[in-house]
Amino acid sequence: MIEDLHWLGISWREGPDRGGPFAPYTQSERRGLYVEAWKRLHEAGAIYPCTCSRKDVALAAGAPNDGDDEPIYSGRCRPVESVVRPARPSLRSGLAGRTNASAATQASPDSPAGFNWRFLVPDGEEICFTDLHLGPQRITAGRDFGDFIVWRRDDVPAYQLAVVVDDAAMGITEVVRGADLLKSTARQILLYRALGLQIPEFYHCDLVRDEAGVRLAKRHDSLSIRQLRDGGWTPEQVRSGVPPGKH
């Protein structure tokens, strides 16, 4: 990836290939930062242990799945004292009173290992931010997304927590990414707030799509930059999206 970015003409002052004051850049070397963030969330009562598998969540009655986004969690392991989300009552059907009390009693306050840990979202709260490209955004917790995983049972931080911790530690002030991650931004804003961190600005790019309107993605066997490069594309053609032989 780094080689492909250089080929495209993109440069940077600091990174894995150059070093710099914000090293290390490999997440396996930054574990201490993630564990510290997990402890702060745990002490604040902002997260809870969960034993549900991905299959459990996907098969939960009425659990919606918005394309590439994860299904909204039914709340089976949610603490009983938390407020039942009103936006999607069907998710609670047959699950009332069935929270996993054993997970809460077995989980260690000093280590996240052995459980999925979910962030307890404020149901009904609108997460508002102004995107630098798409303008004002309003995403509702508990309706557009549910309690999400911040630490996985295989003892590694989940994407949402890792990127928040890394961006804050590295002094990132602007985040540029695809428009398919708007809901992830809402989740991450909640984490920034819970951890008392400065929230960066966001710019969500339009997605690159094929002739059928499907976004280009590895899971769909879409061509990679390396394949385009090997196929005779120039950096200018890749940046403009105009293939060789066309003007």
Positions of PLM-derived features:
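Generic detector of well-ordered alpha-helical segments enriched in charged/polar residues
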Residues: 2, 35, 58, 74, ...
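N-terminal Rossmann-like or analogous alpha/beta NTP/dinucleotide-binding catalytic cores
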Residues: 1-68, 179-180, 184-197
